[in-house]
Regions:
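Substrate-binding/catalytic cleft of secreted carbohydrate-active enzymes
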Residues: 1-138
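Short, low-complexity, polar/charged sequence segments that are solvent-exposed and flexible
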Residues: 62-67, 138-142, 182, 199-202, ...
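Short C-terminal domain-edge/linker segments immediately following a structured domain
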Residues: 73-86, 150-158, 212-214
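Outer-membrane beta-barrel proteins
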Residues: 95, 167-169, 186, 219, ...
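Conserved structured core elements
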Residues: 97-104, 113, 147, 171, ...
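Aromatic-rich peripheral "rim/lid" segments of glycoside hydrolase catalytic domains that contact
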Residues: 122-187, 196
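Beta-strand-rich binding/interaction modules
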Residues: 175-216, 225-232, 240-247
Length: 247
């Protein structure tokens, strides 16, 4: 729908300045939809994400009433015909993990957008009413698929979320990892001044480096800067995955 002057808010995929709905992640996290959201009323990004995963054939046994999982039957038959039915759970788990990761990317990009009025997913649950849309972290019965815990999901979608703007994700050990830390806070109460602890860990949980930064008081309804982290990687001796943890 075209934005009109009478709109008190605007729910859309796109404004006159570009796309506000996000479907993708990027090689960095230092980006947002601020420019695209800068119009004369609050904008809400419509149907963000929509990451489709492989069906979970174990869900078929839940259909005990008048509705039959005919779409599941078609997909299962095709997989069996191609000799890959034994890989069905692997496909489901792998694509499900990718979906969870993509929702984290999408959600955080819009939380970094300080002038965004919000966002709405196509759904937390799969949508079976118009073909097959396996886009949810919950199945069509609103039950968990076992892909992510509620606590883990809330790390990137909650009233208060810590954010890190990273210019890139791949570094050499002669470089310095940098991240601008921010907080999205729409909780009920302001946050007092304090300290934010950060820790860079390897895949085995060993600490590469840790420290803390002093944080200012944070009012409600804001996206605020907390400070910057600079970590020399000269002690990293081989290629590996490192994760930044904050508390």
């Amino acid at each position: 729908r075209t934005h009109t002057p009478s709109d008190q808010y605007y729910v859309s995929h796109v404004t006159e300045k570009g796309w506000i709905t996000v479907y993708e992640g990027k090689p960095s996290t230092d980006w947002d939809r601020k420019k695209e959201s800068d119009i004369d009323c609050p904008v809400i990004a419509h149907e963000t994400g929509q990451r489709c995963m492989y069906p979970n054939f174990a869900e078929m046994e839940k259909y005990t009433g008048v509705v039959s999982p005919r779409n599941f039957e078609v997909f299962r038959e095709r997989l069996a015909r191609n000799g890959m039915l034994h890989q069905a759970d692997d496909f489901f788990r792998a694509t499900g993990a990718h979906t969870v990761l993509q929702y984290k990317e999408v959600n955080e990009s819009l939380l970094r957008t300080a002038n965004s009025g919000g966002f709405q997913l196509l759904g937390l649950a799969d949508f079976p009413g118009q073909g097959s849309a396996f886009v949810g972290i919950l199945d069509a019965f609103w039950e968990s698929k076992g892909l992510v815990s509620p606590e883990k999901y809330r790390e990137s979608c909650a009233p208060t979320v810590l954010l890190a703007r990273m210019p890139k994700r791949t570094y050499m050990n002669n470089e310095t990892f940098t991240a601008k830390l921010e907080i999205y806070h729409y909780g009920e109460h302001p946050l007092k001044r304090g300290k934010l602890n950060w820790e860079l860990k390897d895949g085995k949980g060993n600490t590469v480096k840790k420290g803390n930064i002093s944080t200012p008081a944070i009012p409600c309804a804001t996206v605020d800067s907390l400070g910057k982290v600079n970590i020399s990687l000269n002690k990293v001796s081989h290629a590996e995955k490192l994760t930044l943890h904050t508390t």
